[in-house]
Structures are given as C-alpha cells and as structure tokens.
Curated annotation (Swiss-Prot):
InterPro entries, sorted: Cystatin_dom, Cystatin_sf
One example GO MF annotation: cysteine-type endopeptidase inhibitor activity
Leader sequence residues: 1-25
Short motif (Secondary area of contact): ranges: 99-103
Keyword Magnesium: no
Stated name of the protein: Cysteine proteinase inhibitor 5
Protein family according to the UniProt entry: Belongs to the cystatin family. Phytocystatin subfamily.
Species this chain originates from: Oryza sativa subsp. japonica (Rice)
Site, Reactive site: residue positions: G50
Keywords: Plant defense, Protease inhibitor, Secreted, Signal, Thiol protease inhibitor
Keyword Protease: no
Compartments where located: Secreted
Length: 148
C-alpha cells in the first residue's frame, strides 16, 4: 500500500521541486524591476509591503483633517512655535500619505497660520486603532516644494 502511495506522490513532488526555482526567479526579477520606490500603475498591484500610499481627496478626508488639527494642537501644547507668543492656528492638511506599520503612520503636510503668515509643516502621526491611541512623532517646517 505504501509503495502505491509513493508512486502516486513522487511525480508531484518532483514537479514541485523543478518549478520552485522558476517561481523564485520570477519573484526576484519582479522585485528588482520595481525597486525605484514609486507606485506602479494598475491599481496598486505589485506594491511593496510597508510602502507609502497617497491619500486621495485630502481636503475632504475628515480623519486626515482631524489628525492635522491634532498635530497643531499637540505642537502648541509642547511649546513649539511660540515665536510671537500665540502659537499656530490650524488651517488644513494639504497633502497626506499613509504607511502600514504597527498601526497606520500618517505623513501630513499641514498649512497653519501664525499671526498673518501661512506656514507649512510636515508632521508624522502614528494611529493605533485597537488601543485607541495616536502619537505625533514629528512636526517640522516643510521643505519648499514647487507648487505650494
């Protein structure tokens, strides 16, 4: 009985062993071809695990706007931007990306008012929905980018 099972299973195992290197080579070639850090076209197929994703309709996204407000309030609470004594006033989030980590990491570009000046900041916030918690990791003046 065991020899019949051997003769039935052995060819399948042999085929799998022969095909395994081919699939590994295809995966390695695909990973190398998409190693420029950019999102591929086609709806996200082939995305890198843990890569950043642009948030669509940032100004209409309530969660993103609330996180931007949280960052400005937290920045003021920590004593940042006291150059004129009043702190920052949140205007809006103008761009955002997400990254899945242990939770979701949001990369936000925030417009805020200080006196009569509109300033732009880059902030990073980690949200862990199961705790629930959110932590502002950084809040710094944005590097100048064309178009803003």
């Amino acid at each position: 009985m065991a020899s019949k099972l051997y003769y039935a299973v052995a060819p399948l195992v042999l085929v799998l062993l022969l095909l395994a290197p081919l699939s590994s080579a295809r995966l390695a070639a695909a990973a190398a071809a998409d190693d420029d850090g950019q999102w591929p076209a086609g709806g996200g197929r082939g995305r890198k695990v843990g890569g950043r994703t642009d948030v669509e309709d940032v100004e209409g996204n309530r969660e993103v706007q609330e996180l931007g407000l949280f960052c400005v309030v937290e920045h003021n609470r920590r004593g940042g931007s006291a150059t004129r004594g009043r702190g920052l006033v949140f205007s809006r989030v103008v761009a955002a990306q997400t990254q899945v980590v242990s939770g979701i990491k949001y990369y936000l570009r925030i417009a805020a008012q200080e006196a009569d000046d509109e300033l732009v900041f880059d902030a990073v916030v980690v949200v862990k929905a199961w705790v629930p918690s959110r932590e502002m990791v950084s809040f710094v003046p944005a590097a100048e980018l064309p178009g803003y």
